[in-house]
């Protein structure tokens, strides 16, 4: 598998873990550590998929997803929401904000890889 992934995550242990494992599988990984930087990186890098933490500094994940889906240059990029707050209704809230899929933390890496593959395939 290959493709470009934008990982918007503010916790170093999570972005370090995910970026290393994704790179080993042939993905190019672009990092952003807050929502505002995530929007800027999405516009600059035009990734195939965005992994978006919902609990971010500066601009939270919900607002980031809405901003990405409102902009013509990023609206078609699939977004997979990542959240530790796997509460009832969070999946619906993420989808309503513009996310295309949802993955609760802790990360189930094989499942996340399947979701990434599906998202990239849907974008073709």
Language-model-derived ranges and their functions:
Residues 9, 33:
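Conserved acidic carboxylate
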Residues 16-24:
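Charged docking surfaces used in two-component/phosphorelay signaling
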Residues 107-116:
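C-terminal output helix
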Residues 45-51, 56:
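Active-site beta3 strand of CheY-like receiver
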